[in-house]
């Protein structure tokens, strides 16, 4: 019986994490008016010409990057080989 409770608790935590990630993705992709990051984050967080923005979710500030063309990743740290920039 205890094993079933552990499985249920694990499943509930999994659902909560999944819902949180979906919420962040939906908000960052669908909300055109993002707040700019504070200067100390804007200068350090996004790489390769990415633009830092913040979104407040459930009272917590979340900092993300909008990558310049040709880059991807949470901090725009990876070259996007699927969408290279013409040089």
Swiss-Prot record:
List, in alphabetical order, the Gene Ontology terms for molecular function in this entry: epidermal growth factor receptor binding; receptor ligand activity
Q: Which Pfam families match?
A: EGF
Q: Does the keyword Secreted apply?
A: yes
Q: Which residues form the signal peptide?
A: 1-32
Task: For this UniProt record, give its keywords in alphabetical order, as a comma-separated list.
Answer: Disulfide bond, EGF-like domain, Glycoprotein, Secreted, Signal
Q: Which GO terms describe its cellular component?
A: extracellular region
Tell me the compartments it is located in: Secreted
Q: List the disulfide bonds.
A: 37-52, 46-65, 67-76
For the biological process aspect of GO, one term held by this record is:
epidermal growth factor receptor signaling pathway
Domain called EGF-like: residue spans: 33-77
Q: What does the UniProt PTM comment say about this protein?
A: O-glycosylated.
The record's account of tissue expression is: Expressed by the venom gland.
Indicate yes or no for the key word Disulfide bond: yes
Give the family this protein belongs to, as stated in its UniProt record: Belongs to the EGF domain peptide family.
The molecule here is called U18-myrmicitoxin-Mri1a
> Which source organism does the UniProt entry give?
Manica rubida (European giant red ant)
């Amino acid at each position: 019986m205890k094993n079933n409770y552990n499985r249920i608790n694990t499943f509930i935590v999994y659902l909560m994490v999944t819902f949180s990630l979906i919420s962040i993705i939906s908000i960052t992709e669908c909300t055109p008016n993002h707040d700019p990051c504070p200067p100390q984050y804007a200068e350090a967080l996004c790489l390769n010409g990415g633009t830092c923005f913040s979104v407040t979710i459930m009272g917590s500030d979340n900092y993300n990057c909008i990558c310049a063309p040709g880059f991807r990743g949470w901090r725009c740290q990876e070259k996007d080989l699927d969408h290279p920039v013409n040089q």
